[in-house]
Amino acid sequence: MEESQSKQESNTRVAQHGSQQDVDPTFQTKRALEKERSKPRPRPLPRVQLQSLPGWSSTSNDVPLSQLIREMDHESRRCIHRSKKKLDRSEHISQGTIPEIYEKRKETISHTQSMEQKYLFQNFTKLLLLQKCCPGGSEKLVRESWHPCVPEEGGHMIEIQDLFDPNLDTEKKPQLVIIEGAAGIGKSTLARQVKRAWDEGQLYRDRFQHVFFFSCRELAQCKQLSLAELIAQGQEVPTAPTRQILSRPEKLLFILDGIDEPAWVLEDQNPELCVHWSQAQPVHTLLGSLLGKSILPEASLMLTARTTALQKLVPSLGQPHRVEVLGFSEFERKDYFYKYFAKERNTIIDFNLIGSIPVLLTLCEVPWVCWLLCTCLEKQMQQGEVLSLTSQTTTALCLKYLSLTIPGQHLSTQLRTLCSLAAEGICQRRTLFSKSDLCKQGLAEDAIATFLKIGVLQRQPSSLSYSFAHLCLQEFFAAMSYILEDSEEAHGDMGNDRTVETLVERYGRQNLFEAPTVRFLLGLLNTREMREMENIFACKFPWETKLKLLQSIIGEPFCQPCHLGLFHCLYENQEEELLTETMLCFPLTASGPNHMEATVFQTNVKRLVIQTDMELMVVTFCITFSHVRSLRLKGKGQQEYKLTAPAMVLYRWTPISEASWKVLFSNLKCTRNLEELDLSGNPLSYSAVRSLCTALRQPGCRLKTLWLVDCGLTSRCCSFLASMLSAHSRLAELDLRLNDLGDNGVRQLCEGLRNPACNLSILRLDQASLSEQVITELRALETKNPKLFISSTWMSHMTMPTENTDGEESLTSSKQQQQQSGDKHMEPLGTDDDFWGPSGPVSTEVVDRERNLYRVRLPMAGSYHCPSTGLHFVVTRAVTIEIGFCAWSQFLHETPLQHSHMVAGPLFDIKAEHGAVTAVCLPHFVSLQEGKVDSSLFHVAHFQDHGMVLETPARVEPHFAVLENPSFSPMGVLLRMIPAVGHFIPITSITLIYYRLYLEDITFHLYLVPNDCTIRKAIDEEELKFQFVRINKPPPVDALYVGSRYIVSSSKEVEILPKELELCYRSPRESQLFSEIYVGNIGSGINLQLTDKKYMNLIWEALLKPGDLRPALPRMASAPKDAPALLHFVDQHREQLVARVTSVDPLLDKLHGLVLSEEDYETVRAEATNQDKMRKLFRGSRSWSWDCKDHFYQALKETHPHLIMDLLEKSGGVSVRL
């Protein structure tokens, strides 16, 4: 296999595109973006390049900036709102809509205008959304960090339109959806997108008649509100009387954004007290009643909150739908970057230079950091500076932003005041400030104007309040305030203690390290960042302050369980001394056998669930300073090895980006105590292997054991592995099994093994697919180096004869998938399964028939189509593609889509080298000719480790759906069902007819199934078990409908059981419906018919003639003596049998004693290859009688039934006697 990328990046691309371009006009697909980039520009623009970080290579390839990309069209939406009919004031009063509310809105909340404000993320693209499995109570809402046992999977990826889909367990549509995630990850923007999409008629219109959006930080400014006033404030213009709105509460959706921000306690009122909807009550009581279902129990709610705040939010949330926002995929980070600089900016920036800085690219997983990065670049361009970003942390990036935006040191005093305001707001859980708040704090008018101009502060649209540009920015300023205050304290220890007490009081000890303010504070206590603060504030900080404050904050955690929050804090700090001291000082014993959050640094294995690239980066960074000796990144289906304790196993349900791999491997350059690394089951691209081997060559890397089982490695990767073996003297064990290395790859490894600097003692790799020459070379290496042990199950290697340019026969090796069940052989399929390309047919090989695994080697760039399966690949270069036939029942029953979507085609597990396939056409059996099916209902389902995601195809053709630049995993076509349509979906179907002769009687089996190659293959194999042979007849011409029933009839008196067939879809692993037809004498032939039971119209008929019947062992009449001698079946197909028989030894065992003597048996077995054995066998068969050849034929039929059946069908007749 070339660099397999099964399951990698697929969710990212699905999470990038999906069908959301229909939801938000700002969403752009990758295809549309590339089209925009290709448009001619009116004038050349200057090009600026970034200075990359030391130690990271950068590329010189220039990527043109995309042209103007549409942003949110606020003006058009305002025009729509203005065109709406406005109700008369008297009409409002008479119908109970309380029009005075709209007159008071400027005094209460400014939601209408804020929805039209230019937010930081106006250019927002799509977010990765993970639907989580919700536990039974709210006390477990927060994800546990450490697990003493294997954690369950964390859910599956979804899109914005799936937020209110039925729960997996209950299959009920949720009334409460919680949008959770880290700070700045995009929760509020997602909530606004839902509201905007509903306003524009693109989302949830069939479920909700009214959707109300509320910013909780703005709601908190209101002391009291009635339900009617709340509803009025949630509407931009009154759309209906309040009584009418409340008459159908099940059609209402309340979106409460930032429910965790205000300092309120949401307590439900006494349910026995029925408060009228017009009666005012405290806001927190009103919201608590909504959440507690005391009022409007049928209404739906959507809440957004930081994950750490969920546990203390409300006493009980029932069974919510939990969706975690994971930020940007790697593609969306690039897309956001282009969109930011697309409008009104006359400079093109090469994103590849940013992409070449993996740490920075990983930080940009958080959308707020993306905005921060782009703002810094914009400020540098405006100031005429050379673009240079070397920030390793979010804290460093914030300081860079501050140094670029603050016009001079004359504002340092006012900047201190702003920091104090931020800290006061954080302590009081306030994010909105009045003009008097700013003045009381000491901010001057001109300073406020300056902070507004540079974007640190923003004025709310009502002009009555101010806020920081983002809550994370306020938390950063608050962190600076604590350092400024501590440096001014006369008694430093008291100041430090007071700071820690304030933080603990605000966030709680358990969540202290999860708080962004604390993370920023640790980041600012880095030596380099403190110097930067000194430059900004024009002052000097006593270094004792730094040390004492660090001790005050980090001094407590040794009594606390270690978790992701602490890792984030340590990463932000970056101080090696602090990292080493902290990570090595944790206790090595658990506090108790039931301690669910026992630290990882124990003498056993602990497990940690990580969801994002950022989490993977900070964890791997920190553990290199710890006691951990073994690290496993859990992949799919990998074999478990016993790890050396203390060990850590990382679980991740979402794809790992290329940037994340680079960061992970960069952290291995100095591993300290880490000696074992297991990446088995994780697909590694060509560039990822290069990064890994580069890290392993570093002198500071102490890895001794590396497991890379089933990582999709190819011969291209072996040059890096060989170079690493030559340079890395510590690596002692390397496992490369279940990878497609081939002869060339193993030869390169041998070169590395011969190097005197190589100390490898154990090498595990598959040898079944290797040629004799390479196996001999491996044995010679073992003989020459007694310390080297090459471990493998030494099985007979399988080769296929090919013809070289000289016409001589040569051997071509192919991958052997080694399983515990034993040797799996490989054989070519018939020509029906060939791929047809630019140079003609390309044969498909059987890798493992039991596992339905096949392989095709496409020799050059071009388009290749397989008529049998319907698959179509467009490739840019020579590539090897593995194709597995799967059953939907393995995957679909675990998702709610089985009720909302219909299977529309076969399911394939495809693996191919990353970037080699530019398009794949996946077959479907939905008939588009009828004009009854909208192509927008088609989706491609990807089943990955983290769950299932849906991707919208680039286009849908009559027989296939097209994916461009695909990523691969088990994938197939689904059709979204419309309730009104039900089963009235026209499909393309086929009829399959099988027969078996018994004396004079004939038995037929007739199937009517969707045109799905996996179903056809499953039926073929089932019928073959009972020696039934298929007859090829044309399928029904017209489209049929699932669930329809058809009457089976014949032109002769025959026995038919059952006489009706239903057209339905059943998974290939399930039994298929068929009718059995018994015919005593076929005579000149019979006519079979299928008639629609409801309308009694003929939909299919076929004529079966005696010439259609070719039994497996037909009776042949003796030929006249003067007629030319007939060739026996084995002689007719000698060439095919020599080339395609792959298990010769079992064949010889059946012939031993009947046809072969002991000497003949041993002589044939002594040959080196299967082809040589078959040639030797045929040379001896020249003296065999016809009966001996019959025995030979029977042995072939028993050992290679599929091969014999294929030859029989193609030959049209045989010469075999009974």
Curated annotation (Swiss-Prot):
CDD domains, per database record: CARD_ASC_NALP1
Domain CARD: from-to ranges: 1122-1211
Polar residues composition-biased segments: 7-29, 799-815
Annotated ranges, domain FIIND: 835-1118
Residues covered by region (Disordered): 1-61, 799-842
A UniProt-annotated Pfam family: NOD2_WH
Cysteine-cysteine disulfides: none
Region of interest called ZU5, as start-end residue ranges on this chain: 835-968
Single annotated GO MF: pattern recognition receptor activity
Record-annotated site: Trigger for autolytic processing: 942
Segments for region (UPA): 969-1118
Activity control, per UniProt: Activated by cleavage by B.anthracis lethal toxin (LT) endopeptidase. Cleavage by LT promotes ubiquitination and degradation of the N-terminal part, releasing the cleaved C-terminal part of the protein (NACHT, LRR and PYD domains-containing protein 1a, C-terminus), which polymerizes and forms the Nlrp1a inflammasome. Nlrp1a inflammasome is inhibited by DPP8 and DPP9, which sequester the C-terminal fragment of Nlrp1a (NACHT, LRR and PYD domains-containing protein 1a, C-terminus) in a ternary complex, thereby preventing Nlrp1a oligomerization and activation.
Broad class of enzyme this protein falls into: hydrolase
EC assignment: 3.4.-.-
Record's keyword terms, sorted: ATP-binding, Cytoplasm, Hydrolase, Immunity, Inflammasome, Inflammatory response, Innate immunity, Leucine-rich repeat, Necrosis, Nucleotide-binding, Nucleus, Protease, Repeat, Ubl conjugation
Result of altering residue 969 to A: Abolished autolytic processing
UniProt binding sites for ATP: 181-188
Localization in the cell: Cytoplasm, Cytosol; Cytoplasm; Nucleus
Domain spans labelled NACHT: 175-484
Residues annotated as site: Cleavage: 968-969
Oligomeric form and interacting partners: Interacts (via LRR repeats) with BCL2 and BCL2L1 (via the loop between motifs BH4 and BH3). Interacts with NOD2; this interaction is enhanced in the presence of muramyl dipeptide (MDP) and increases IL1B release. Interacts with EIF2AK2/PKR; this interaction requires EIF2AK2 activity, is accompanied by EIF2AK2 autophosphorylation and promotes inflammasome assembly in response to danger-associated signals. Interacts with MEFV; this interaction targets Nlrp1a to degradation by autophagy, hence preventing excessive IL1B- and IL18-mediated inflammation.
PANTHER family recorded: NACHT, LRR AND PYD DOMAINS-CONTAINING PROTEIN 1 (PTHR46985:SF3)
Domain notes: The leucine-rich repeat (LRR) domain may be involved in autoinhibition in the absence of activating signal, possibly through intramolecular interaction with the NACHT domain. The FIIND (domain with function to find) region is involved in homomerization, but not in CASP1-binding. Autocatalytic cleavage in this region occurs constitutively, prior to activation signals, and is required for inflammasome activity (IL1B release), possibly by facilitating CASP1 binding. Both N- and C-terminal fragments remain associated.
UniProt similarity note: Belongs to the NLRP family.
Protein name (database record): NACHT, LRR and PYD domains-containing protein 1a allele 1
Organism: Rattus norvegicus
Gene name tied to this protein: Nlrp1a
